Amino acid sequence: MARYIFITGGVVSSLGKGLASAALGALLQARGYKVRLRKLDPYLNLDPGTMSPYQHGEVFVTDDGAETDLDLGHYERFTGRPATKADNITTGRIYQDIITKERRGDYLGATIQVVPHVTNAIKEFVLDGNDDYDFVLVEIGGTVGDIEGLPFFEAIRQLKNDLPRDHAVYIHLTLLPYIPSAGELKTKPTQHSVKELRSIGIQPDILLCRTDREIPKEERRKLGLFCNVRESAVIEARDVDNIYAVPEAYHNAGLDDEVLAAFGIASRIPPELRSWQQINERVRNPEGNVTIAIVGKYTGMKDAYKSLIEALSHGGIANKVKVNLDWIESEIFEKEDPAPFLEHVNGILVPGGFGQRGAEGKIRAAQFARERDVPYFGICFGMQMAVIEAARNLVGIEDANSTEFGPTKEPLVGLMTEWLRGNELEKRSQAGDLGGTMRLGAYPAALNRGSRVSQVYGGATEISERHRHRYEVNTAYKDRLEQHGLKFSGLSPDGVLPEIVEYEDHPWFIGVQFHPELKSRPFEPHPLFASFIQAAMVQSRLV
């Protein structure tokens, strides 16, 4: 039977519960255990699909088409286990399911209440489908004290009593701020956070304390005394130089040993961490540097591109170089010449996005890369803008544009109205809802034999990648674009939807309709990112 680890947060948000959960999952995995990670999000949205990137950050898409929290990306990258739609749920989804059942009459006239109906739904979600796992790590979003989170805290409180003895452990992630004027770490915020947690019936078994310095023994003793935990269970979560150093740092601090002790499990074998040590060796001792310009719309909120940042880092790890990122707001290029901003970079990446704001700037970035032979990687929207640039400046279609921005005489990019998902036909219309209506999840693509992208994938002629888009390049313009050098080197297996474009006579210019960053791992860098960084290394010698 699976054992459950519940990770909560206190004092402030954005402490890194997702990373802590992922790192602990990796440590347990390194000891030979089979782990599953799940996220409970207290907000009322059904999913983060329609939320602003400025508020929520990246939307992480799974193979089965779920739009989920970015923490699931950490889970995948650290454990290698693909997440599914069953690994993330929101208050909105729970309420929707309950109300649907109530309208159907499933509750036989009962008064629907938070306790027991909402809490039971949360417990059912947490417990479902875990028979094949040794440990299930469940992260509760937000911080203790948030009104939205109360049903989730009540549910995990009940679960400890529902499960057999020694089958549930609570870890509370908190902050120990350092006050320079006093010259000491302050424990009072953590004490109050634990007091709040205990007031709703949850006694943490382990305190994971974020800090930028060593925790003095006296402060550990104080935290153990006033928070009612063993002194050995006060774990120091020191800041590290890169996120892939977190598993080893937490192991050295004793987190995984303390978790096993809390379950009454004798430590069998130490975790095998050599692969993590090798990753960190490459991160800390690069053999060179490259600079990549990210020309995007949400550059003020780096979390909007979380998986992208990590995938570029993985490309650097694969090539033993440090990848420096130059963030550029694409709107700038609508007013200014891109050259002064881009002449020094070794590669240009235009990521996914939505809407007209900044689109012309992205088109100009693609033009600069094409004309100056700078490696270019266009992802989703970035591919579409590269195609529009080619249509305007190579083919001579001056009015080439996307119907996403309004009516146009030359719709190079248009709304997908239907596509195949397996053997089923999916249909959409302009008047449809925004939420959950995109082409989402893993879809296959057929690659042209001998094309550059096929070579990047090791000679493969069919791949599967994750998508998140509702607009698509119009194949009616395919022949004219190919006559001017822009090759459609990847299509959906039925030949209807363009997936990949490339220039054969360019050092490295590839646009993809999918999101390869979602499948990149530190131990398995995505081939497109590894190849892109390799091309940037070559370009760096020419600057």
From Swiss-Prot:
Active site location: C380 (nucleophile), H515, E517
Catalytic activity: UTP + L-glutamine + ATP + H2O = CTP + L-glutamate + ADP + phosphate + 2 H(+); L-glutamine + H2O = L-glutamate + NH4(+); UTP + NH4(+) + ATP = CTP + ADP + phosphate + 2 H(+)
Positions of UTP binding: S13, K186, T187, K188, P189, T190, Q191, K222
Residues holding ATP: S14, L15, G16, K17, G18, L19, D71, R238, D239, V240
Binding positions (Mg(2+)): D71, E139
GO biological process, one term: 'de novo' CTP biosynthetic process
Region (Amidoligase domain): 1-265
UniProt keyword terms in alphabetical order: ATP-binding, Glutamine amidotransferase, Ligase, Magnesium, Metal-binding, Nucleotide-binding, Pyrimidine biosynthesis
Record-annotated Glutamine amidotransferase type-1 domain positions: 291-542
One cellular-component annotation, GO: cytosol
Pathway: Pyrimidine metabolism; CTP biosynthesis via de novo pathway; CTP from UDP: step 2/2
InterPro entries for this protein: Class_I_gatase-like, CTP_synthase, CTP_synthase_N, GATASE, GATase1_CTP_Synthase, P-loop_NTPase
Regulation affecting activity: Allosterically activated by GTP, when glutamine is the substrate; GTP has no effect on the reaction when ammonia is the substrate. The allosteric effector GTP functions by stabilizing the protein conformation that binds the tetrahedral intermediate(s) formed during glutamine hydrolysis. Inhibited by the product CTP, via allosteric rather than competitive inhibition.
Gene Ontology MF: a single term: glutaminase activity
Chain positions recorded as CTP binding sites: S13, D146, I147, E148, K186, T187, K188, P189, T190, Q191, K222
EC number of the protein: 6.3.4.2
Subunit structure of this chain's protein: Homotetramer.
Free-text function comment from the UniProt entry: Catalyzes the ATP-dependent amination of UTP to CTP with either L-glutamine or ammonia as the source of nitrogen. Regulates intracellular CTP levels through interactions with the four ribonucleotide triphosphates.
UniProt record similarity statement: Belongs to the CTP synthase family.
Protein name (database record): CTP synthase
Source organism (scientific name): Bradyrhizobium diazoefficiens (strain JCM 10833 / BCRC 13528 / IAM 13628 / NBRC 14792 / USDA 110)
